[in-house]
Amino acid sequence: MGLQLVFVVEANKKSKTDWIYIKDTIDRFYKYEAAHLKLSTVYMDGKNKYLSKKKEVNLLLSQYSVASTNNVTKVIYCFDCDDYDSNPVDKEFLEKTQEFCKANDYEYVWFCKDVERVYLGKKVEDGHKNSEATRFKANKLINGVSQSRLNGKSISHNMSNILSVLDKYKPHLVRK
């Protein structure tokens, strides 16, 4: 049986910044066989476009299931928390996206307050996100990110739940 994990991320297809951090996380913390695990990405090009990506997600799902009736696809939406703790609009957005994921049987990964603060420990201005992600990958900075920072149980600053979510996919993903 093959497993496809479809990551739906906020970044756009050109920059791929979110995917750089997520893929480095998978490669750093998990063993997997590429023949049995397919990693796919859907780029939202902004978090507010999450509803418009269902068609693209469903296309990936159907393409993978056609290859073998034993193939399974799981969808993982990834969101920054932004100012959830001080801005009611951001808090409401998080609640709406969590409900959306639950209603569609999708996984929900959060980065608090954003993916850069989780992996780099600092806020990165929009114009520098691409260069910071490139530097992160080139310098293998994932090796300096602690598992505890990526294994959050509840939303808190500079944390994510990505490892908690990915741990559900044994035997396809096994912690190193």
Model-derived regions: residue spans:
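C-terminal accessory helical subdomains adjacent to catalytic cores in phosphodiester-
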Residues: 1-5, 16-46, 54-176
